[in-house]
Structures are given as C-alpha cells and as structure tokens.
Amino acid sequence: MKAFLLAAGLGTRLRPLTWTVPKCLVPIQGRPLLAWWMDLFEQHRISEILINTNYLPDPVRKFIKEYNQTRGKVKLVESYEKELLGSGGTVLINRNFVENEEDFF
C-alpha cells in the first residue's frame, strides 16, 4: 500500500521552531517527526510514500536520501510544489502515484 505524507506547509503554529527547520523534521524526543512517522508506516506495511515539500525542502530531501540509503523498508519519494497546492491539489497532481492502488493513505 502507498501513502501521501503532506509535509509542505510552513509550520506557522510551531514557530519559532520552524523558522529554520521544516515542521516534519522538528525533533521530538531527539528524533525528527518524520522518523517517527516512518516507524509507523513500516509497522503498517506501507511500501512507498510520496512526501510533498515546499518550505525548506533541502533538509527533507536529505532525510529522504539518507532514509532510502540506510533503512529503505519504505521507499520515499518527493514531490516538490513551487506553490502550495493544499491537500487535494497534492493528491490530484500526483494521482498517478496511486493509480493502480485499491487503497492508499
């Protein structure tokens, strides 16, 4: 099963933490939030996750690259949005990602 992880937002409610760190990489108990999510997705046998990015995309790209190289239980792919599209917009422009899936998260 595949999943969308909507991580492109500005994280305004988490400021000042998100002035320099994207919200999906804010540390919780010493680990980025994205690492906690990956643990959950692995437990639920998600095979591939599309992560949308916009604000501070480079640290997220680095996380994706390192995760794919070291853990790799779930394949992570990025979809960069030059302009934020909202939840529905992200799913719409990436519908081919789940085209042959019966279900997706």
Model-derived segments and their meaning:
Residues R15, K23-V26:
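Pre-signature/interface helix of ABC/ABC-like ATPase nucleotide-binding domains
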Residues T18-T20, K75-L76:
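Short glycine/proline- and charge-enriched loop/turn segments
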Residues K2-L5, P27-F105:
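Conserved N-terminal catalytic core of the sugar/cofactor nucleotidyltransferase
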Residues M1-W19, H44:
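N-terminal nucleotide-binding beta1-loop-alpha1 segment
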